[in-house]
């Protein structure tokens, strides 16, 4: 039987693996080329009910676990986990995320721009672990540029005086973010750092578990 979403409009959606749930994306606010925040709602196809993914603030890059029983997402540079079989209980996986210093599970500006992705974490195939990239951009200098009223969209707050936008931007020869890979065991809640055959200034352009669960 066809079910109707009870929300009048939305920006995008994500289906659960068995298509019994739909994540409804609303109130989308762009950050950079690929990244954005949004408010997500979990729509149950069977009972036609919808509830917020989280009430703690806008979310980024939500991802269903392969078994469809969990959703991980990023908020304020930290990774969170919602367990759908336990009344959508929410727990925080990382705690050191901080604006302009540390990003967990989402890339910095350079990675997003050059490698073209906005999510830096993944579930294992058995849904028991999460692997993620941690970006330490605390040593990357700030870069600023002026903001004017302009058009499409019009920034009316800068109609008389220009504003200024600052973000972390490494010029040639300046340090990039320091990157590392970590795993989180959902049952034991143990986080481990993975030793990688990577130079200090090396890149990690993607993160993905293999189906065998042996490699990342």
Annotate the PLM regions:
Residues 7, 56-60, 97-100, 198-202:
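Short coil/turn segments at the loop-to-beta-strand junctions that recur within blades
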Residues 9, 58, 117, 177, ...:
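Beta-rich catalytic cores
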Residues 22, 68-71, 130, 213-214:
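Hydrophobic beta-strand positions that form the internal "hydrophobic ladder"
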